[in-house]
């Protein structure tokens, strides 16, 4: 759930019998591709990683931490943090042979203070953070050149050329309302081709706006992007 375990990128085989390799094999056997969601830049306070390394979260000494979606930003400006997270993810991906990875980011970067830098160098943290993201993504695409990799602008507003160097598509916005998406995708198209815009047909009424929009409209808007479905297909008619 949203409250725990971000930072602990290990498979719970009590929930998934045979682990991800068995699940991926079953999915592939159906003629489908297998994808995984990850959020490598974040950490939950209720996680083994935070209990072991509380200093690995960005937080300003003497100030209350700002939590968003019950999570904090990992201090990925530190090499040991980057390596720990990516090694966990590599272990999972090596085992399951995933075809697709969604690199999510559900909150902006704040509590900006790194325990690894002196006070007079804290102004470097934002820049170092972005360079760290690029380094982590570089390691991912170098290791898995055939992987379809999608990054996210939802929390961090990071729809930009630097991210597209590593991921050919970016989740355009967490707002999936088709009417709102008309403006979002139209505006994005001034800077980027529609092939880069993550766009899905979502549930109705929409989660964010509560709006009811015809299925055809939602499909047309999503097709002006990468096109996908973000709903329970088992509840749909043929």
Region locations from a protein language model:
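Alpha-helix-loop-beta-strand connector modules within alpha/beta enzyme cores
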Residues: 17-32, 125-144
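Alpha-amylase-like alpha-glycosidases and glucanotransferases acting on alpha-linked glucans and related
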Residues: 66-97, 165, 198-203, 219, ...
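Active-site-proximal substrate-binding groove within the catalytic cores of carbohydrate-active enzymes
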Residues: 133-238
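Active-site beta-loop-alpha junctions enriched in small/polar residues
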Residues: 39-43, 106-108, 152-156
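Hydrophobic faces of well-ordered beta-strands that scaffold small-molecule active sites
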Residues: 34-38, 101-103, 150-151, 229
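Active-site groove signature of glycoside hydrolases
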Residues: 1, 84-118
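Conserved, mostly hydrophobic/aromatic
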Residues: 27, 85, 104, 149, ...
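Aromatic-lined carbohydrate-binding/catalytic grooves of carbohydrate-active enzymes
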Residues: 1-84, 100
């Amino acid at each position: 759930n949203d409250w725990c375990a971000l930072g602990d990128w290990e498979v719970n085989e009590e929930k998934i019998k045979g682990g991800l390799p068995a699940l991926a094999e079953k999915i592939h056997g159906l003629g489908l591709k297998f994808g995984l969601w990850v959020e490598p830049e974040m950490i939950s306070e209720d996680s083994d990683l935070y209990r072991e390394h509380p200093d690995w979260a960005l937080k300003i000494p003497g100030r209350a931490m700002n939590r968003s979606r019950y999570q904090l930003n990992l201090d990925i400006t530190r090499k040991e943090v980057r390596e720990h997270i990516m090694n966990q993810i590599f272990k999972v991906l090596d085992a399951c042979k995933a075809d697709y990875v969604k690199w999510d980011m559900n909150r902006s970067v704040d509590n900006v203070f790194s325990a690894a830098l002196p006070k007079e160098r804290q102004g470097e943290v934002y820049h170092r953070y972005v360079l760290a993201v690029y380094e982590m993504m570089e390691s991912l695409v170098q290791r898995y050149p055939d992987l379809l990799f999608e990054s996210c602008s939802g929390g961090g507003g990071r729809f930009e050329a630097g991210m597209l160097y590593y991921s050919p598509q970016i989740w355009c916005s967490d707002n999936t309302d088709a009417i709102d998406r008309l403006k979002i995708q139209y505006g994005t198209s001034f800077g980027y081709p529609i092939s880069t815009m993550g766009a899905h047909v979502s549930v109705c009424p929409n989660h964010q706006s509560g709006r009811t929009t015809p299925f055809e409209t939602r499909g047309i808007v999503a097709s002006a992007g990468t096109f996908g479905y973000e709903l329970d297909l088992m509840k749909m008619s043929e």
